[in-house]
Amino acid sequence: MRRALIPTVLLALAAAGSLAAAPAAFVYVGAYTHWEELPNHRNPPGGASHGIYGFRFDRDSGKLTALGLAAETRNPTYVAFAPSGRTLYAANEIYQFRGRPAGAVSAYAVDPATGGLTFLDQVSAGGAGTCYVRPDHAGRNLLVANFGGGSVAVLPVNPDGSLREASAFVQDTGSGPNPRQAGPHAHSFNPAPDDRFAIEAEFGTDRLMVYRLDSATGALSPADPPFVAMAPASAPRHFTFHPNGRIAYALGEIDSSITVLAYNGASGRLRPLQSISTLPPDYKGKNTAAEVLVDRAGRFLYASNRGLNTIAVFAIDGAGRLRPVAQVPSGGRTPRGFCLDPLGRWLLAANQDTNNVAVFALDPATGIPAATGETAEVRSAVCVQFLPGLDHR
C-alpha cells in the first residue's frame, strides 16, 4: 500500500514539475489538533495533528503528493472554499476564543500556483464548538454552525475573502430524546441553490430549520414554516441538495438514516418523501453516520458510516428517491468526511481513527468506488476537500 507521508513544513514545489503533464488538483485535509479542548474528549489512536494539510492530486493516477502543513490552526475540523476557489475557510472547533465561550472561523488566501495558504483573519463564530462553514453561492456570506453552542451565524465576506463580524446570529432552543440531545446542537448550515434560503441541520432537536437569507445584508429571518421535523432521535447532521435544486437529502447521525425531501424554492418549504437506512439490513453493530454527498450528475448519493466503516452507495431515481447499491469499506476506521472529485472520477475518504485519507476510483456506470491502494497519512483526519474551480498542471 502506497503512503504519502506528511512533512512538518510546506514542501518546495519545484519537484512537482514531473507531474506537469497530468491533470491535477489541490486537496486539503482538516484534522483535530487539541482534543483536550473538547467536552468529553478522548485520546485519539494516532495523536493529534497541527492544522490543515495540503496535497497535489493527480487526476490520471489518483496519486496524492504531500505538500505539508499548509496552515497551523486549532481544530480545523471542517474546511470549505469560496466559489472562486481563491479563499479557504476553516471551522475552528474550539470552546474559548479571545476569553469568551465561542468558536472561531479562519480565512486563508489560496495561491493558485502552489496551493499555499496565506492567513487573512480569524473571527468569532458567536457560539462554541464551531463545526461547519459554507459560503453562499454568490460568495457574499459565510454560513456557520456551532455544535457546542447550538447556534448559527452569518459572517459577511470582504472583497479580499476576509471576514467581518456576524451580521446574523440565531441561538437554538430545545432538546431531543437521546442523551446526546440534551440541548440544541447546530451541525451544518447550507444555502439553498439560489441563496434565498438557508437550511440548518439541528442535531439536538431533530429539526431542519429554514431561514430566509438576505444575501445583500447577511440577515436571517424564519421561513414559513420555520422548520420541518425529522424522526425522533435521528439527530440531523448534514444536508445537501440534488443538482436539480428540487430535491434535498438530510443525514441522521444517530439513527444512520437519509431523509429525502422535496424542496419548494419559492417558499423554502421542505417535504419528506422517503427515509432509508445507511446500513445493510443485517448489520446489528454500533454506527453513526457522518457525511452525505450527491455526485455532480445527480445519479448517485454517498454516505459514510462510522462503526461499519463503509461508504454507502445509493442510486437516485428520476423522483430523487434512493435505492441501495453497495457498501464499500472506507479504507480505514471511522470515515468522518469524504469528498468527490469535481470531474466525477474520484472519491477521497478521511478515516479519523486510522489517521489516513484513502483514494477510490468511481465507476461511471455503477457509481461504486473502487479502492486504489493510494493513501495519505494525516493524524485525526476528519475533513477532506478538493479545491474547486482550478486545475493545476
Positions of the model-derived regions?
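Short, solvent-exposed loop/turn segments at conserved positions within beta-propeller repeat blades
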Residues: 43-49, 97-103, 147-150, 182, ...
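Asp-box/WD-like beta-propeller blade repeats and closely related beta-sheet repeat scaffolds
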Residues: 115-188
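Residue position within the beta-strands of beta-propeller blades
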Residues: 29, 36, 90-91, 144, ...
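Short loop/turn segments immediately following the C-termini of beta-strands
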Residues: 32-34, 93-95, 147, 157, ...
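A short beta-strand motif characteristic of beta-propeller blades
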Residues: 65-71, 118-123, 174-179, 223-229, ...
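Beta-rich, blade/repeat-based domains predominating
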Residues: 38, 73-84, 126-141, 175-196, ...
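Short, conserved, GDST-rich strand-edge loop motifs in beta-rich repeat architectures
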Residues: 25-47, 90-104
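Short loop/turn segments immediately following beta-strands, especially the blade-tip
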Residues: 56-62, 108-115, 154-164, 211-220, ...
